[in-house]
């Protein structure tokens, strides 16, 4: 039986945080806390979770943190993940314009099909340690990589991350990933008003010069300082308006489960994506669940509760029992988030402790 929630959304994407430790102290993310709050698990436990979930229809696994490259043994973990083969799933929903989901008119449930493709394994990293690990990770079976990078000016980058000389390490990591063939290679930038919105056009130039996809992300209320306010959000429409001052953009058709609106420059050189969960929610076609570094399932970034999968394993649950537990959790997946609404309740964990 494949995973789908009560709104008909097929769950095919899994994010696993393998640590909530990070060697960066980005000012919008952490307020001085450098250590892990929840700890992490042996890789064999994450591997078992992934194996059970792949048997339920997961086709994409993204490793996150914290900073996942801090974990010794991450290359071998990727190698073991790459041995898994997804079952495949045909989604059974379409997205309405208001961000909610409805069942397909002529399809009542998700239909399995034979999938011979390998598991799609991705990694989100700050890139500081990527230069030396890009090729080993590619050789182990990593498919693609996303680098978090909030400025292309070295001095601004150092002020944001509170790490001196970090920019050069990250740029070297991006270039090493490109040489290794980790593709598509994406660079994510969280935009905050009064902080780094002046980096929009420089990032457009960076995309063209470095041959990467730059994705701007609207600032979400997931930071440790709880300083988020609607006024801090640089919206999709504003990003497009500013980028148009540099060069015209042409929208690229995208899949319904993609989080980003995608654009390329008019001459075809350089790609920009915009992830706009605040101004343009995409909850109606969400296909994701997350596992935190301490082994708990989260069905939404903004969940106010966790579901302890690792506790089931500690109690000696069989794979069949884990499948039943996972299915019961997915059935409770939220329809949408409530950012900006009067009844919004902040997530029970901040982003670094959920997994970016």
Predicted features along the sequence, with ranges:
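Conserved G/P- and acidic residue-centered "switch" motifs that form tight phosphate/ATP-binding loops
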Residues: 67
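Radical SAM/AdoMet-radical enzyme domain recognition
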Residues: 43, 47-62, 71-98, 109-215
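N-terminal [4Fe-4S]-dependent radical SAM core
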Residues: 1-15, 25-27, 55, 60, ...
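Radical SAM enzyme [4Fe-4S]-AdoMet core and its adjacent flexible, acidic
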Residues: 155, 164-168, 175-271, 277, ...
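Radical SAM enzyme core and accessory elements
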Residues: 1-4, 280-356
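Short glycine-enriched, charge-decorated loop/helix-capping segments at active-site entrances
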Residues: 32-40, 158-165, 228-231
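Canonical Radical SAM [4Fe-4S] cluster-binding loop centered on the CxxxCxxC motif
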Residues: 6-45, 55-56, 301
